[in-house]
Amino acid sequence: MLPVILNPLRLKTGLVGQGAALARRATLLAEAGIEVRLLSPDVSDELLTPLQLLFVAGLGEGEARHLAARARSFGVLVNVEDTLPLCDFHVPAIVRQGDLLLTASTGGAAPGLARALREHLAESFGPEWRGRVDELAAERARYRSQGLPPAEVSQKVRAMVVEKGWL
């Protein structure tokens, strides 16, 4: 596995599914700022072709397998919720506090552990981290505007975290 943070503004993303699984996935994508095209399970090739990512949730395995194969034939990366063999990528357990994004993944091997780790991270990095990230970003921008080299900027930001006792 290779963890990657994707810019949702650069992706054409589709979502196909039904029921509670579809609703959960739609919420997850909305929280990530992804503008998603909600498609029916019998989506046309014309609508699949421009996509780069396709999320499938709440469909039977046979239907999901067929849809995933069709999407892949157009170069679309596919995630079928809870069906590892049909996934080109996985979505980790997520804790989001403003711009701070923490994730935990077991590559699908132990979802319960990933969930427990997410809960632990959420307790350890609460809403106060939103302001902390903003504060650090402002200081970093100030240091960079002064023309400091990247290594020195990193050192100063790290020193600020230590000085404030955040970690």
Residue ranges and their predicted role:
Residues 53-54, 64-91:
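ADP-ribose/adenylate-binding Rossmann-like module
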Residues 1-42:
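Hydrophobic, well-ordered beta-alpha structural blocks that scaffold small-molecule cofactor pockets
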Residues 52-59, 88-108:
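Short basic, glycine-rich beta-strand/loop surfaces that mediate nucleic-acid
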Residues 43-50:
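Short amphipathic alpha-helix with an adjacent loop that forms part of the alpha/beta core around
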Residues 41-43, 82-86, 107-108:
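Short, ordered loop/turn segments at secondary-structure junctions
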Residues 20-21, 61-62, 108:
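Residue-level detector of alpha-helix initiation sites
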Residues 108-167:
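An accessory alpha-helical subdomain
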